């Protein structure tokens, strides 16, 4: 009987040891599971934080790009306005001068009339003074007469109305000026009507 008691005691001790081992394994597994769970949670949080940081960087880049584009657009608009303002200032008299060209033509025709009387000569003298004054004002605004006779024909500033033949001159040379042409700064207001050598 004593032997049996020892065996029972040993068996109970074995059971306690086995249960202790099982509990220890279970506890170890639970600790490992919680550590894995924490790692998963950390990695998910890290991923979220990384995604948030990446999206924030993209947003900052987009905002900076938008700011740079707006700045460039503003600079371009200001430059365009400045160029438009300069062009408007440079050519402000264009419309008025275009309207005055027929007046200048009429003054020139009036000055070509030959007079025999003293009274008519004084009127012509007055017309000439007005013409010169008007011409000075137009030159002050930048109006220039286009040179034509003896020049090579240039379709940008000359308008060929007829062709004539002169063997002493080169082909394409302007022989006669039929109506004066004018340039304002660098724009042609009216091309010169010319006769060109064949």
From Swiss-Prot:
Q: What is a single Pfam family found in this protein's UniProt entry?
A: GrpE
GO CC term (a single one): cytoplasm
Q: What GO biological process terms are annotated to this protein in UniProt?
A: protein folding
The record's listing under InterPro entries reads: GrpE (IPR000740), GrpE_coiled_coil (IPR013805), GrpE_head (IPR009012)
A GO molecular function assigned to this protein is: protein homodimerization activity
Chief localisation class? cytoplasm
Cellular compartment(s): Cytoplasm
| Keywords tagged on the record | Chaperone, Cytoplasm, Stress response
Q: Tell me how this protein assembles.
A: Homodimer.
The protein's matches in HAMAP family, at most eight in alphabetical order, are given as: GrpE
Q: Which family does it belong to?
A: Belongs to the GrpE family.
Q: Which NCBIfam families match?
A: PRK14140.1
Q: What does this protein do?
A: Participates actively in the response to hyperosmotic and heat shock by preventing the aggregation of stress-denatured proteins, in association with DnaK and GrpE. It is the nucleotide exchange factor for DnaK and may function as a thermosensor. Unfolded proteins bind initially to DnaJ; upon interaction with the DnaJ-bound protein, DnaK hydrolyzes its bound ATP, resulting in the formation of a stable complex. GrpE releases ADP from DnaK; ATP binding to DnaK triggers the release of the substrate protein, thus completing the reaction cycle.
Q: What is this protein called?
A: Protein GrpE
